[in-house]
């Protein structure tokens, strides 16, 4: 996929300047990496919003053109307004196409319709939604596909069970002791088990709330002494 983003350098910074940019349908951004100084830029809100409608934009190598100069980048961080969900700022990371990069890629679970246990009412409990990987930019996948069609009730799928494409490394499994870092990413569970887990979470939250209230009352009593 060949995706291009046009940008202009900006000389002003700060909350006031950024608000003025957004009022004029521009988004503040920054690009850094490969040993070069960071560069503050502005993006057209309509262009970047259109590109981000395609989920693959988040995990693709992008052509960033700043004042007619082209650089290869990936989106490193994207900030949104907490209430409006509109884009407020983007960080781009410059990359060398001949050097490996480390980034997080979303997990795509496949085979739910073919899973016998799930057809009978079992549910998939996900522990992870993304995996940190290392690879050359040219090998960067848009998602990590995980087949769960064969899983039975109570069966986990771990990092080492994932069929990773050639040229891609799961960083968690490069720290020496694979057994220690071989995390479970999902399990097939009975609906009853899921309900018990949710109930336990609620009970723990309530216990924690009661403890805080009790501690506050104790501290209040002490302050009156």
Swiss-Prot record:
CDD domains: Ribosomal_L25_TL5_CTC. InterPro entries: Rbsml_bL25/Gln-tRNA_synth_N, Ribosomal_bL25/Gln-tRNA_synth, Ribosomal_bL25_b-dom, Ribosomal_bL25_C, Ribosomal_bL25_long, Ribosomal_bL25_short, Ribosomal_L25_dom, Ribosomal_uL5_bac-type. Gene3D superfamilies: Ribosomal protein L25, beta domain, Ribosomal Protein L25, Chain P. GO terms for molecular function: 5S rRNA binding; structural constituent of ribosome. GO terms for biological process: translation. One of its GO terms (cellular component) is cytosolic large ribosomal subunit. It comes from the Bacteria. Keywords: Ribonucleoprotein, Ribosomal protein, RNA-binding, rRNA-binding. The keyword Transferase does not apply. Residues 206-225 are annotated as: Disordered. NCBIfam families: bL25_bact_ctc, PRK05618.1-5, PRK05943.1. This is one of the proteins that binds to the 5S RNA in the ribosome where it forms part of the central protuberance. Belongs to the bacterial ribosomal protein bL25 family. CTC subfamily. HAMAP family: Ribosomal_bL25, Ribosomal_bL25_CTC. This is Large ribosomal subunit protein bL25. It comes from Vesicomyosocius okutanii subsp. Calyptogena okutanii (strain HA). The lineage of its organism: Bacteria, Pseudomonadati, Pseudomonadota, Gammaproteobacteria, Candidatus Pseudothioglobaceae.
């Amino acid at each position: 996929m060949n995706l291009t983003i046009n940008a202009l350098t900006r000389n002003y910074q700060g909350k006031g300047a950024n608000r003025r940019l957004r009022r004029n349908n521009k988004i503040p951004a920054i690009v850094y990496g490969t040993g070069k100084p960071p560069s503050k830029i502005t993006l057209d809100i309509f262009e970047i919003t259109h590109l981000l409608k395609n989920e693959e934009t988040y995990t693709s190598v992008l052509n960033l053109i700043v004042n007619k100069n082209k650089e290869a980048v990936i989106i490193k961080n994207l900030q949104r307004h907490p209430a409006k969900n509109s884009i407020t700022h983007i960080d781009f990371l410059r990359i060398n196409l001949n050097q490996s990069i480390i980034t997080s890629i979303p997990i795509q679970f496949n085979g739910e319709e073919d899973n016998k246990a799930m057809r009978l009412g079992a549910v998939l409990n996900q522990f992870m939604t993304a995996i940190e990987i290392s690879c050359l930019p040219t090998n960067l996948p848009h998602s990590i596909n995980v087949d769960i069609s064969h899983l039975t009730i109570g069966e986990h799928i771990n990092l080492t069970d994932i069929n990773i494409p050639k040229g891609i490394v799961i960083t968690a499994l490069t720290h020496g002791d694979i057994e220690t870092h071989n995390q479970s990413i999902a399990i097939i569970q009975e609906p009853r088990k899921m309900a018990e887990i949710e109930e336990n979470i609620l009970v723990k939250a309530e216990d924690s709330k009661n403890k805080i209230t009790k501690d506050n009352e104790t501290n209040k009593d002490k302050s009156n002494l």
